[in-house]
């Protein structure tokens, strides 16, 4: 960016998972950063400690001196800061456009797909960090190795997850992309699945002629768009058609071990068959960059996932795991990973649906996602600013789950969920808190409660 023109950058919703990493990178590059959010959080405290000025609550006064205003997809047009910025003639841009600006001066590696973006981005960043690449990395979750959502590197590469939710990933200019999967999601923005597929085709074709698109050949929706991709394609998966192929895949001690081409064998550090695919995407990208397989293997076998990705919050006689899963496909993957890892233990899933629109569009799929837990607890919907939809609620979902023969409870809020758990948990239980809303607070509360009981 032209520093003579842009010095002060304001972020509306600066505490959001997609926003704070970009803000941190810009802080580290010497820009003056201000921001606003609805509540305090450890993320906001970290940004303040790095030099950002952050306001709690949205006000016209917050933007008056900004050179540009960056907003997240959660910010509505009637936000007072958005309105004031436009009145003052201050440019307002979505976070994806600011990310694209950061990528413009780098070789971009953009990780896309309906699921697994944060983990795959973290894996690629971890592998490249073990080489001389020293990449800049921006992810949607806090990675333990960085202590934050972002790392400013000195190398020529920028690795980021790309957000398809509002189409802003089409603003990026990546050299290499990965498409891990395509699923029906973000119904408020896309008309249907075909509309989503078209966006991913456009995304893949954004890479230059010397770039590449790594794609999951085992995902039927991804496979269906291959004829329309006009760039080099690297296919990964279990299929014999894959360029980067996993075979002899087996479960050992709750984690997957597999062989890749004639490169060698990997024993993943993170559970779940979905993470085999995330690892294959990573291998495809890093192999394209001529990273030695021994470096890839060591990095993946010692990889520690981002926050809220099968994050163990408490481990003793009872296990508490927190996960961001909020789509039926993600829920099934996380619950399957838990069953693989904790074979004979009772699993209790506590799920907080996220957005009425998502629950409405995928109601049956959500209801069928809970056949693995021994007990399921469903809370009321976390609205994320949406208005309620008639006959769409956590209580209705619990009723539908019960129709499929599963043991389910409905609670209206997290406090009720906590009280219920305290009454039913027993030695040996594995508790998973699942969702993209405030459900993570319950995992912290439970971890504290169980620690104090020791």
Swiss-Prot record:
It catalyses: UDP-N-acetyl-alpha-D-muramate + L-alanine + ATP = UDP-N-acetyl-alpha-D-muramoyl-L-alanine + ADP + phosphate + H(+). ATP binds at residues 113-119. Pathway: Cell wall biogenesis; peptidoglycan biosynthesis. GO terms for molecular function: ATP binding; UDP-N-acetylmuramate-L-alanine ligase activity. It holds the Pfam family Mur_ligase_M. One of its GO terms (cellular component) is cytoplasm. It is found in: Cytoplasm. One of its GO terms (biological process) is cell division. Its EC number is 6.3.2.8. The keyword Ligase applies. The keyword Cytoplasm applies. Cell wall formation. Belongs to the MurCDEF family. This is UDP-N-acetylmuramate--L-alanine ligase. The gene is murC.
């Amino acid at each position: 960016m032209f520093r003579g023109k842009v010095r002060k950058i304001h972020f509306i919703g600066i505490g959001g998972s997609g926003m704070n990493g970009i803000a941190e990178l810009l802080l580290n590059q010497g820009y003056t950063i201000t921001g606003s959010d609805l509540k305090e959080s450890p993320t906001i405290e970290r940004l303040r400690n790095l030099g950002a000025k952050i306001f709690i609550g949205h006000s016209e006064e917050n933007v008056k001196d900004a050179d540009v205003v960056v907003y997240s997809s959660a910010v509505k047009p009637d936000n007072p800061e958005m309105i004031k910025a436009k009145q003052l003639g201050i440019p307002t841009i979505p976070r994806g456009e600011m990310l694209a600006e950061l990528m413009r001066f780098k070789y971009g590696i953009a990780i896309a797909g309906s699921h697994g973006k944060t983990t795959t981005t973290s894996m690629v960043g971890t592998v490249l960090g073990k080489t001389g690449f020293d990449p800049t990395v921006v992810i949607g979750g806090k990675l333990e190795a960085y202590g934050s959502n972002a790392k400013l590197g000195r190398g020529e590469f920028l690795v980021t997850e790309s957000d398809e939710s509002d189409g802003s990933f089409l603003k990026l200019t990546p050299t290499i992309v990965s498409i891990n999967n395509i699923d029906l999601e973000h119904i408020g923005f896309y008309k249907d699945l075909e509309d989503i597929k078209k966006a991913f085709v456009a995304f893949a074709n954004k890479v230059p002629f010397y770039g590449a698109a790594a794609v999951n050949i085992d995902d039927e929706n991804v496979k269906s768009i291959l004829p329309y991709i006009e760039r080099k394609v690297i296919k990964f998966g279990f299929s014999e058609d894959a360029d980067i192929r996993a075979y002899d895949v087996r479960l050992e001690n709750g984690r997957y071990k597999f062989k890749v081409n004639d490169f060698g064998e990997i024993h993943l550090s993170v559970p779940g068959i979905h993470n085999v695919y995330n690892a294959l995407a990573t291998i495809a990208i890093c192999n394209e960059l001529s990273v030695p397989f021994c470096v890839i293997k060591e990095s993946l076998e010692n990889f520690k996932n981002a926050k809220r990705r099968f994050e163990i919050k408490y481990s003793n006689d009872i296990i508490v795991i927190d996960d961001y899963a909020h789509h039926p496909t993600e829920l099934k993957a996380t619950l399957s990973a838990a069953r693989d890892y904790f074979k004979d233990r009772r699993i209790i899933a506590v799920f907080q649906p996220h957005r009425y629109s998502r629950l409405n569009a995928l109601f049956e799929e959500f209801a069928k996602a809970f056949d693995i837990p021994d007990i399921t607890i469903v809370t009321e919907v976390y609205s994320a600013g949406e208005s309620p939809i008639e006959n769409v609620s956590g209580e209705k979902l619990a009723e539908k789950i019960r129709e499929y023969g599963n043991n389910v409870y409905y609670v209206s809020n997290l406090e009720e969920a906590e009280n219920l758990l305290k009454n039913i948990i027993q030695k040996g239980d594995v508790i998973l808190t699942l969702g993209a809303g405030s459900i993570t607070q319950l995992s912290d509360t439970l971890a504290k409660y169980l620690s104090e009981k020791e």
